[in-house]
Amino acid sequence: MPRKRKCDLRAVRVGLLLGGGGVYGSRFRFTFPGCRALSPWRVRVQRRRCEMSTMFADTLLIVFISVCTALLAEGITWVLVYRTDKYKRLKAEVEKQSKKLEKKKETITESAGRQQKKKIERQEEKLKNNNRDLSMVRMKSMFAIGFCFTALMGMFNSIFDGRVVAKLPFTPLSYIQGLSHRNLLGDDTTDCSFIFLYILCTMSIRQNIQKILGLAPSRAATKQAGGFLGPPPPSGKFS
């Protein structure tokens, strides 16, 4: 009798089958009774569904993490900035000056006297100085928030390192791909890394949280302010 060949254990793989299971080797194939083996196409479909469900779960987890970090950032800012008397006073002055300046700009005409134009320019300069002071008050909270974000990002980045957490519906620009495809295998540029999705979610969610909590600057202040709060006022009209 010919000697039986030993099975190559390294070539043996256990496949999950629809309705049961089976064992496959390089020299044999065995399926359990009552089980129907999946075709290679069905196996690829099942694997793809599993990957998509995993990415969806990772995306929801990252959104939840972003919400928590945004709330933490606003909590730190409230403790260090929002509740202080100096911030409240500067914010009230900026709001008052912005509305007053906007109203004057709407009523002034091109034929206005030089004295009126000089008065508006002085108010613009005063508003710019108050905005700068307001930004400096908020600056001390930015260092604490930056430290917390860096620590949390490093911790979660080690958990999601090398994992595709989402599929982008577009191909990112070449200078963004270093961030969107960071530490990912393969050449598919639509694969999204943790750090890219985390930054996008945190930036957008925090702005919405500020609006919901009433901590964002008003439209008038944003329109008239320069620096951190918005574009500089178009003063060329009055020169």
Swiss-Prot record:
Modified residues (Phosphoserine): S111, S239
InterPro entries: EMC3/TMCO1, TMCO1
Lumenal side: 1-55, 158-171, 182-191
Membrane topology classification: Multi-pass membrane protein
Intramembrane segments: 172-181
Expression (tissue specificity): Widely expressed in adult and fetal tissues, with higher levels in thymus, prostate, testis and small intestine and lower levels in brain, placenta, lung and kidney. Present in most tissues in the eye, including the trabecular meshwork and retina (at protein level).
Ranges of the Cytoplasmic topological domain: 84-137, 214-239
Cellular component GO terms held in the UniProt record: cytoplasm; endoplasmic reticulum; endoplasmic reticulum membrane; Golgi membrane; mitochondrial membrane; multi-pass translocon complex
Pfam family, one: EMC3_TMCO1
Location(s), subcellular: Endoplasmic reticulum membrane; Golgi apparatus membrane; Mitochondrion membrane
Illness: Craniofacial dysmorphism, skeletal anomalies and impaired intellectual development syndrome 1: An autosomal recessive disorder characterized by craniofacial and skeletal anomalies, associated with intellectual disability. Typical craniofacial dysmorphism include brachycephaly, highly arched bushy eyebrows, synophrys, long eyelashes, low-set ears, microdontism of primary teeth, and generalized gingival hyperplasia, whereas Sprengel deformity of scapula, fusion of spine, rib abnormities, pectus excavatum, and pes planus represent skeletal anomalies.
Protein name in UniProt: Calcium load-activated calcium channel
Species, as recorded: Homo sapiens (Human)
Taxonomic path: Eukaryota, Metazoa, Chordata, Craniata, Vertebrata
